[in-house]
Amino acid sequence: MKYKDLRDFIRQLEAKGELVRISQPIDTDLEMTEIADRTLRAGGPALLFENPKNHDMPVLANLFGTPERVAMGMGQESVEALREVGKLLAYLKEPEPPKGLKDLWEKLPVFKQVLNMPAKVLKKAPCQEVVLTGDDVDLSKIPVQRCWPGDAAPLVTWGLSVTKGPHKKRQNLGIYRQQVIGKNKLIMRWLSHRGGALDFREWCQTHPGEPYPVSVALGADPATILGAVTPVPDTLSEYAFAGLLRGDKTEVVKSISNDLQVPASAEIVLEGYIAQDETAPEGPYGDHTGYYNEVDDFPVFTVTHITHRKDPIYHSTYTGRPPDEPAILGVALNEVFVPILQKQFPEIVDFYLPPEGCSYRMAVVTMKKQYPGHAKRVMMGVWSFLRQFMYTKFVIVCDDDVNARDWNDVIWAITTRMDPARDTVMIENTPIDYLDFASPVSGLGSKMGMDATNKMPGETDREWGVPIVMDEGVKKRVDDIWDSLGIM
């Protein structure tokens, strides 16, 4: 199923019983978070708060609160089908020429999909039906949530920030939280390695003192939103990838005040600039770790224009101790990661990011081990191949007889196949999540690899244990008489 815009997605979710409208007045201050959190933890529907207190604009929450809705947003029928998205990305990351006519025929669907990659530029767009400038620019009219009691201020959470480096052909779409600090000002919290921050740094180097243009889209279509959080190759724009997911070109329009292209169907667009010498203390905020993060200075985004559709819908979320919406996104995107990793490391059988590990801080890998030290090669590969795993603190590698998604299996492998001194790899002074207050230095910490595989000659001189397995014939005979035994 494909969706042309957010409203189309809302209609189809509602038809499937995957969205509930809430007409009762609900406060954007804390109440929406509590309702959305309870709903998400119960595996419930997306929520459309039609009457947020003190605002005329409805709020859409918990949109991607189940892996199934993430899959739907990516145009797939099931979570399992997301592996096909991963295979497509793996191919686009390292394309191979067809090996013959048969291979060419098999790749034809991919080539057809590629035709949907270029964005379609419109001259008029729904996102610019209403244009606000000057004193009419007022962020307080948008029902921005304050999510937790200790949060410093309301926080824009689902904004797609559009940036462009001075030497780059394509734009970057990134999702960075933005603290509201005034009628027309937000704090742009982007970490130093993220695309927007890199673009801004290059701009400062080549255009010293000049304001940096930025546009932020709120309420884009699901393919574009999810394209911004998916590990697309550096040579592929998020708009192009969204076109692949949607099966139709992404429609964009030039911002009114700058040359950046924004999703034409977005509900709201904030346009403005970042002054190179203006920063402000951001936070504290409750984050996906389950803790409040420390206060730090980040650039200030000054909004000069707000454009929006008639009767716009504000798309919002919250972050907190897993499960939260980012954790659910992680569960779904996990299926996209697997084929990408397998293309580079065919020995990998499965890859799992436990949601309770804050989506990316721990990874469990199962593999077909072939030689001594093989598990360590896979560890290093996970840390280095995709930048999404730059901040993964713990990598556990097991054999393919272990279910990576079953902690009973994983803990059994760790406690029976590991010697802590021999099978633990420690690496110090590596990039680490800025939000990780457990690291000794902000942004710099250690990583641990755990080799929970069966050991080969060269790794041990001892006789290795053989797993206990019941005789298949006995199991079948007991299966045949089990019901008659009346045990349970």
Curated annotation (Swiss-Prot):
Q: Which residues bind prenylated FMN?
A: 175-177, 189-191, 194-195
Annotated binding of Mn(2+), by residue: 172, 238
Location in the cell: Cell membrane
Q: What is its main location?
A: membrane
Which gene is transcribed and translated to give this protein? ubiD1
Gene3D superfamilies from the UniProt entry: Single helix bin, UbiD C-terminal domain-like
Is Metal-binding one of the keywords UniProt gives this record? yes
Q: Which GO BP terms apply?
A: ubiquinone biosynthetic process
**What InterPro entries would the database entry show?**
UbiD (IPR002830), UbiD-like_C (IPR049381), UbiD-like_N (IPR049383), UbiD_bacteria (IPR023677), UbiD_Rift_dom (IPR048304)
Name of protein = 3-octaprenyl-4-hydroxybenzoate carboxy-lyase
